[in-house]
Amino acid sequence: MATLKEVAGRAGVSQSTVSRLLNDPSFSIKEETRRRVLRVCEEMGYRNVFRPAIAVLDAPPSGEELQDAYFADLRKVLAERAESLELDQLTFIRSIHELTERATEFDGFITVGATVFPEADLRALHMVLPHGVCIDTNPAPRLFDSVRPDLSQTMLDALDAMIAAGRSRIAFLGGVGSIMGMHDYPEDIRELSFRQWAAHLGLETDGLVYSSGTFTVENGYRLAEQLVADHREAGSMPDGLIVAADVLAVGALQALNALRVEVPDELAVVSVNNQSIAWYTSPPLSSYAIDQRELARMAFSTLIDGLKHERRVRR
């Protein structure tokens, strides 16, 4: 069966033009071009499949190389998924204002990145482009859908693994994040889940949660340094440490090494993300993987489902 790309090539138009001509009755195009595209579709036996034009709202990078690497991997996975679905090439847009201005070019969008958008900007975008899926977090759950890893379950798994390994005094190291809704919170879901599950498991957390600042190597170093300063001389060192992200864990391991804390004998360390950098740390870092391919698959599936059925209930 002919592909969208082959039809577009023979007709001398873009893939998005073919897609919008076949799927959008209001799409304005020269009659000569319309007839040519339809003729090519018939000649090649092209069977129309809904292929929306999708933008990726790629929030500005944090400036932290390791954190940016996570989003770079995610962008690559999204592009690969779009290609496998035979969608037109994704359009990556850095500014929510630009996406709002160019809304008529797209059927929907997917967001990646850690930027927190103002409520007014999100509402303005929804007015002109109501179908969107946010990956990792959702700044406006009443307006847009979201696809997120189950970080609460990851925290429980990490705690269970620590306990099974004989660790009983377990600390947490994290940063400030945004969870759901149009608000900034002093905790992100990993810290909240750690506290919840630790309490459920009967573990002490007072004085063992170090969660402030940004998700950077430098901040990971600072927080681990503070943890050791608070507990080593007092004889209250934890024997386990769960870190919210690999980028923090790299800095934490550097600090622990500089302070001669034996990992994992004295302090077992696990992290979240399983980025490639985690494979080369010394000592090696145990890290729970986030399945980016599954996130991408679900993001496209959710967006296309919403577009096909004009779904108003957000996921």
Residue ranges and their predicted role:
Residues 53-160, 164, 233:
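Alpha-helical recognition/docking segments in bacterial nutrient-uptake
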Residues 44, 162-166, 227-237:
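Glycine-rich phosphate-binding loop signature in dinucleotide/nucleotide-binding domains
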Residues 55-56, 105-113, 171-174, 210, ...:
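Periplasmic-binding protein-like
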Residues 1-52:
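N-terminal helix-turn-helix DNA-binding module of bacterial transcription factors
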Residues 229-315:
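Flexible loop/turn connectors
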